[in-house]
Amino acid sequence: ISMSCDIRICSDNAVFGQPEVGLGITPGFGGTQRLARLVGPGMAKQMIYTARNIKADEAYRIGLVNAVYPQEELMPAAKKMAAGIAKNAPIAVRHCKQAINEGLEKGMDEAIVVEEKLFGGCFESYDQKEGMAAFLEKRKVEAFLNK
């Protein structure tokens, strides 16, 4: 499930693995595809073929997780990160996600076209106007309204 998430953080006692080959099956539900896209095909093959579990520090080192926190700091860190995302213009965050996801499925030139269209789409929003005005006026954004 975690490999389906945009951002993955864990506590320092987390353990990750793909044990399926030890059960005589392949990882399902996108496990082979998501892992390869996150950590690269070589590391994904090693993890899947050996069915070896890895600890949080190794998961961070190979790019499976974005950050590792002590257990008692995990939830506050997650809330802080969520608040940091939530304070930004929802339309812009959504367009960034779309640009990244769609761009990964295309060549660089096509991906840039996707990004340009989404970038331009932001200029039709109230949130862009408020964000740019606040920047130019050297003040905080009053509110992003998701429109």
Write out the residue ranges for each language-model feature.
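Crotonase-fold acyl-CoA enzyme core
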Residues: 1-91, 125, 130-133
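A short acidic, helix-capping loop that chelates divalent metal ions and anchors anionic groups
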Residues: 20, 102-105
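Helix-loop "lid/cap" segments that line or gate small-molecule binding pockets
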Residues: 47-48, 99, 103, 118-123
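Acidic catalytic patch
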Residues: 93-101, 133
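Short beta-strand->loop
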Residues: 107-112, 146
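Terminal low-complexity tails and localization/encapsulation signals of metabolic enzymes
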Residues: 133-147
